Amino acid sequence: VITASTAHIEQDECGAAERFIGSKVLTVETNNGKITTDMVKKHLHGFDFEHHSQPKVVSITQVTEMGTVYSPSEISEIAGFVHGYDMFLHMDGARIANAAAALDMPFRDFTTEAGVDILSFGGTKNGMMYGEAICFLRPGLSADFKYIRKQSMQLASKMRYISAQFIAYFRNDLWLKNATHSNNMAQALLKKISAIQGVLINQEVESNGIFFSIPKEVAEELRKSYFFYPWNEEISEYRLMTSWDTKDSDIEGFTKLLSEMMSSS
C-alpha cells in the first residue's frame, strides 16, 4: 500500500493496516498532504520479484490530513496511472463531506467518475455518532468482503443502528449543511487569527483545518483553555479543526485569548 507520510493509516492506526491485512505500507513525503504520480512512481519497481513487496494499492485521503482538497482531475490522473499498473486506488474519506462542500460538487464527480476503486465514506467527523461505510466502486471487489468483515470483528450485532444514521445524515442534505458550516467556520477562524501579529499560517485552508505556528509557551498556556493538537513540534506547528457544531462564540473566545497571549509573549 502506497500512501502519503501524513496519512492516517500510516500515522494514527497503531500499525493496524500492516498487522491485519499483512501488507507493507510504503510512504511518500508531501508538504501539503497530497500525493502525485511522480511520488508514487519511485515505489513501482520489483514487480514479480519475490524479494520485494508487490505494489497493489495507492491510498489517498480526501480531505487530506493537512486540510487540503484533491480536485477531480488530480484524482483522475492518479487513478489512470495506478490502473495502468493493475493497481487499485483507495480513498480515505473520513472528511469526504468537507471535500464535497469545498468543491461544490456531488461525491460521484470526484470518486466513481474520477476512477476511485474503494472508498471509506466517513460520517463521524461530520456529526454522526459513529460509523463508516465501505463503498466498492469497481464491480467484483466486494465478493469476499462479508467474510473479511466478520473475521476482522467489524460485524456488529446491531449493525442496522450504525447504518440507520446514514438515512438521517443524507435526508434534507444534513451532511452538506454540517460540512458547509464547518468549512465556513474555518474561514472565519482563519481571518481572525491571521490578523494576530506573530501567528504564521502554514497551509492553504481549503476545508475545516488550519495549521499554524505560534510560540510553544503560548500554545501550552492556550491549550489549558482550548483543546487542539500539536502537529510539528520542530516548527511549533499546531492544528485547529472546526466542526459541524463550532459556534461564533467559540471563535471569538479562542482568538481573543490567543491575541492577548501573543501580545504579552
Over which residues does each language-model region extend?
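Conserved PLP-enzyme active-site core in the AAT-like
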Residues: 1-203, 207-213, 217-221, 225, ...
